[in-house]
Amino acid sequence: MEDARGISFITLMIIIAVVSLILRIAVEQIIKVTVAQNESGASATLKLISTALENYAKDNQGAFPSNFSVLTQNNPSYLDKDYLAESPFKGYNYSCLRLEASGYSCSANPTSCKLTGTMVYTITTGGLLVWEKCESNE
């Protein structure tokens, strides 16, 4: 009888190890898919912001807005929502460090490097989008 209990314990431990391995792989894949979706969304959102800023400038003798909220206050609005005020949005924080009449520079940073995104995106006047790997402080 003692042998049967010993085998049952070993069997249970093997089952737990296999289930743990499967869960680990599943969680890693879920994170990869989420990161890919967040990154795709971040670059698309920055392009949307850039298009709104460029359209505003076309309608205002080439002058870009000095306040981001102007893009959502006009009727019709240039943007459906204020992405800067609603940050974080889908795993990314949005900011426009340079927003003046002569141009702009807006960026999207992952809320948690390597967990919600691996890239930092920046878009500047004219719609030039650049990206680089985020640096984790771990």
Regions found by a protein language model. Give the residues of each.
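N-terminal single-pass transmembrane signal-anchor helix
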Residues: 2-30
